[in-house]
Amino acid sequence: MPMSKLFPPLLVAILVSGCAGMTSPTPPSPPAPTTPAQRTAAAEALAVERQWLGSWFRDTPVKVAQRGDGAMSIEVPREFSFDPGKSSVKPALAAVLDKVAESLRRAPQAQVPLLAAPDDAAVITPLATQRADKMREHLRSRGVAEARLGRPAPAASASVQLRLIAAPLPLP
C-alpha cells in the first residue's frame, strides 16, 4: 500500500489518541457584579436559589433562610451530618451539599464564605475544623471552584452552617 494512503488514517489515529487524555479547561468565574443593576440581579438570583433550595428541603430538618444582610443561610442538624467522633460527611449532608453545588452552578455570582461544622459537644475543636474541611472538599468534588469557597471553620452551634452571598465579598 502506498504511503500516501496510510498517512491520513495514521494522522487521525495520532490526533485522536492525543486528545483522549486531555481535560477541558475550567471556565473562568464570571466577573463580580460592579454596578447597582448587576448587584441587584445577583441578589435576585440568590433569592431564586433560596426558594429552590427551600422547596427541596421543605418538611425536613434542614433550615434555609434569608439573613438580614441578604445572604442565605443553610443549617443542617449535626446528627444528620456526621457520626460521633468522625469527620466523614453522612449521606444526608452530602445530599444537601449536592443541592448547594447545583445551586451554585445556577447562580454563578454566589459564593460560600462560611462553611462551619460543629464538634460533638458543640465546641470549637480540631474535629469541627476537619468536618468543615470535608464539607469544602465535597463541594469542590462537585465542581464548585475553590475561589468561591471560604476557609472551613468550626461552628459554635449544634448545626452545620453554610452561608451563601450574592456578590463576592472578601473571603475570610
State what each model feature region is.
Residues 1-9:
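Bacterial N-terminal signal peptides that target proteins for export
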Residues 15-18:
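C-terminal motif of bacterial Sec signal peptides marking the signal peptidase cleavage site
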Residues 20-23:
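Bacterial signal peptide processing site
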Residues 52-61, 83-115:
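Periplasmic peptidoglycan-binding/anchoring modules of Gram-negative envelope and division proteins
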Residues 59-61, 67-77, 84, 107-109, ...:
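Extracytoplasmic
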